[in-house]
Amino acid sequence: MNDLKYISGDLVEAWIGINTGSLVAEVVGYNPLYQEYILTNWYIEETRGVISITEDRITPISLTPKILEKNGWKLSHGFYWSPNEEGAAVGLSSQTGYVWKAYIGRHPLRSNINSVSDLQHLLFGLGLNLEMEV
């Protein structure tokens, strides 16, 4: 069995085609027979329902301070703190604003978080809400 790069709920940028270009979409499944991810978003739902595309047409979305703030993360003492309702103090810090380190409280948890889907996987692994907007 292959390890999947993306899981259900991940937000990604997908190259749809010449006329449409690329769109932000949500991974809703994986078809192992054709090795394609199944994606949807408002545009895809209106026109086709869902689409299946190969991994080479998917690009991770860079995790930025703007995206964190849009999702309720608050900057305090050099860390962005998670708005989760479960009470876990998940914090992110970055020297560059694009490569992040995760902490539980002040204890290191994971480094090299580069994309929205990386953060979603971390939150999923902690049993926290992984829904995000970009």
Residue ranges and their predicted role:
Residues 1-2:
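Short alpha-helix capping/helix-loop boundary micro-motifs
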Residues 45-74, 110-129:
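Intrinsically disordered, low-complexity, charged/polar segments
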Residues 76-82, 129-134:
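Short glycine-rich, low-complexity/disordered patches
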Residues 31-34, 38-52, 77-110:
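Acidic, low-complexity, intrinsically disordered interaction modules
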Residues 19-37:
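Short beta-strand-centered aromatic/proline hotspots
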